[in-house]
Amino acid sequence: MPTKNDGAAVWELIHQIDNLDLNSSYSYLLWCDMFSETSIVVEEEGEVVGFISGFIHPNKPNTLFIWQVAVEAAQRGKGLGTHMLLQLLNRKRIAQVQYIEATVAPSNLPSQYLFLGLAKKLDTECVVGNYYTSVDFPRTGHEDEQLYKIGPIRRANNK
């Protein structure tokens, strides 16, 4: 689980990834500190190479919403994103989760493949629909965001 000590390194990781929105360094401190049970950080040789920020949806307690998935360039294509998501699903805090949701821009093919592949691996559905449009964002230049909803997630103890 991440700790507040990971916040700065997570910010640096996100800063390196062009297609992710870079939030304030303070926000990553909060994610790593206050949302550590629903987020994950992966280190290799002392460096942060992967991070997922997530939270239990306040209006849907059976849904884990994934805010960002970040994988360092040298680690891409190795299944690290899927591995991190599966590790999150194994946590006690997330035992009640039956669905994963995330918003993905149409140009973000790696995230599309990640969530579609996760649904296939979990042998469940992935429903994609419109969610935020470009006019919902301030100023110009932000793409639409589609909602990916994966589930229901069947666990070994409730099959």
Swiss-Prot record:
BP terms from Gene Ontology: ectoine biosynthetic process
Pathway(s): Amine and polyamine biosynthesis; ectoine biosynthesis; L-ectoine from L-aspartate 4-semialdehyde: step 2/3
MF terms in GO: diaminobutyrate acetyltransferase activity
Pfam families for the chain: Acetyltransf_1 (PF00583)
SS bonds (residue pairs): none
Database matches in InterPro entries: Acyl_CoA_acyltransferase, Ectoine_EctA, GNAT_dom
Keyword Transferase: yes
Segment forming the signal sequence: none
Domain of life: Bacteria
Enzyme class, first EC level, given as a word: transferase
EC annotation from Swiss-Prot or TrEMBL: 2.3.1.178
Domain N-acetyltransferase: 1-138
Keyword tags: Acyltransferase, Transferase
Family in the record: Belongs to the acetyltransferase family. EctA subfamily.
NCBIfam families, sorted: ectoine_EctA (TIGR02406)
This protein's name: L-2,4-diaminobutyric acid acetyltransferase
Organism of this sequence: Virgibacillus pantothenticus
Taxonomic lineage: Bacteria, Bacillati, Bacillota, Bacilli, Bacillales
Protein encoded by which gene: ectA
